[in-house]
Amino acid sequence: MRKIFLACPYSHADRVVVEHRFQLCNSVAAKIARSGSVVFSQVSMSHPINAHLGDLDKASIGKLWAPIDAVFMDAMTEIIVIDEPGWKESSGVQREIEIFKNRGLPANLWSEVSHEFGD
């Protein structure tokens, strides 16, 4: 059984873009789960919680999530990146990819592996 950490760019000045990314993560995570694989989507988990962290700035929110993400990344055996616009520029996505590569684990783009999870 595959154990997948799902990554996607998240932050953006336009709240509509952020919401789109959240919904896209949910859709992709559902597809992966239906295939029988384990999936952890950090954006799917954190987005609703972030709505209750209005007193924190972006940097503080990132610091809050970093150790939580690390626990989930340690449990997963590959990362799949939703390669939406902004994924290459996302420091969070790049950090997550690097963590998996440093562990010798696969790092794939959704556009290249989506066919492995059915229609």
Could you say what each language-model-derived stretch is?
Residues 1-119:
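Conserved catalytic or regulatory cores that recognize and/or transform ribose-phosphate-containing ligands
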